A protein has these predicted regions:
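Catalytic Walker B motif of ABC-type/P-loop ATPase nucleotide-binding domains
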Residues: 49-52
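Helix N-cap at the start of a conserved alpha-helix in ABC-type nucleotide-binding domains
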Residues: 60-62
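Helical segment within the ABC ATPase nucleotide-binding domain
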Residues: 64-76
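H-loop/switch region of ABC-family ATPase nucleotide-binding domains
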Residues: 84-85
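Hydrophobic anchor residue at the start of the ABC signature
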Residues: 38
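A short, surface-exposed alpha-helical micro-motif characterized by mixed small hydrophobic
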Residues: 90-92
C-alpha cells in the first residue's frame, strides 16, 4: 500500500488531479481511466506496460497528454509494447514500429530511420 504522499506523487506524475483519488472510477473519462492504469503500474513499479489502443477514443488533448506520459516512462527505462492503428503516435512515442497484417509481423522499423511521410507510405504498402 502506498503512503498518501506517494499516492499523490503517482497521480501527479500521470496527470490526475488530487481529487481523483476520492472519486469512483466509473465517473472518470476514458483518458482518466487510461492514466489510472498507468498509475497502478507505476505504484507496482512495473518494468513493462502492455497497452492496447491506449489513445483510441481520446480527444486530441488527452491523447497528447497520454503520449507525453508514455515518452516520460520510456525515458525512465520502462518497456512499453503498444498496439495501435495510429502509426504517427507510435513514431512519436516509440523506438521501434512493427507493422502487422493478418496476425503476422510484416515489417519492423526503428523510429529513427523513418519520417512521418515514410510511416504513412509504408503502412499503405502493407495494408493494400
Amino acid at each position: 500500500v502506498q503512503a498518501a504522499g506517494d499516492q499523490q506523487d503517482t497521480l501527479d506524475r500521470v496527470g490526475l488531479q488530487p481529487e481523483a483519488a476520492s472519486r469512483r472510477v466509473r465517473t472518470y473519462s476514458k483518458g482518466m481511466r487510461q492514466k489510472v492504469g498507468v498509475a497502478v503500474a507505476l505504484a507496482k513499479q512495473a518494468k513493462a506496460l502492455l497497452l492496447d489502443e491506449p489513445t483510441s477514443g481520446l480527444d486530441p488533448k488527452a491523447s497528447n497528454e497520454f503520449s507525453e506520459l508514455l515518452v516520460q516512462l520510456k525515458n525512465d527505462g520502462a518497456a512499453i509494447l503498444m498496439a495501435t492503428h495510429d502509426l504517427f503516435r507510435a513514431k512519436e512515442t516509440g523506438s521501434r514500429i512493427g507493422i502487422m497484417k493478418d496476425g503476422a509481423l510484416v515489417r519492423e522499423l526503428s523510429t529513427d530511420e523513418v519520417s512521418h511521410a515514410d510511416v504513412e507510405r509504408i503502412y499503405l504498402e502493407h495494408m493494400h
